[in-house]
Amino acid sequence: METKSLSKSTICCFGDSTTWGDNGCGAGGNDISWTSHLGALLGGAVVENFGIKGSRIAIKADRTDSFVERLDGIDDAADIYIVFGGVNDFSRNVPLGELGSTDVHEFYGALDYLIRTITARSPQAKLVFMTPCKTSGKHEKDIPASDELNHLGLT
């Protein structure tokens, strides 16, 4: 089997605080983010970090930086798109919706929008989704742990 080198690839990383590079103490940045190491690990690939702390995949009225709302600001010419998010949707009670939903105010509908929009704009690109990391819920904010119910009764 032939392995394709990713060293000449452009990779767009779209996410929340984990992508941004949050250190868990209110600071951080791209220099400590997993994205800053990815390019070197792949032999020099160009890696763009589009992480924003606290952002959600779905649209909610209290913020304007959801993945859906930020999609127009990302690179349409990337070879690979990595979408790493969902923990803020869970912790901030975004409804899941139903599979097949196109409502961008629900998690499933927002994911549908991301997939359709990215693949329409960049049909040659690979699309990778990373699921949120398990959380302990030990935080100064009222955020449930991964194994606790959120206010919608979901885990």
Where are these regions (language model features)?
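Short, flexible hinge/linker loops that cap or flank conserved catalytic cores
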Residues: K4-S5
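Conserved SGNH/GDSL esterase-like catalytic core that processes O-acyl groups on lipids
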Residues: K8-C12, T18-G109, P144-D147
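Short hydrophobic segments within beta-strands
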Residues: F14-G15, M130
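Active-site phosphate/pyrophosphate- and oxyanion-stabilizing loops and adjacent acidic/basic residues
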Residues: S36-H37, R116, L154
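A short helix->loop->beta-strand "cap" motif at the edges of active sites that frequently abuts
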Residues: G44, R121-L127
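Alpha/beta-hydrolase-fold catalytic nucleophile elbow
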Residues: F84, M130-T131
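Substrate-gating cap/lid alpha-helix
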Residues: K134-T155
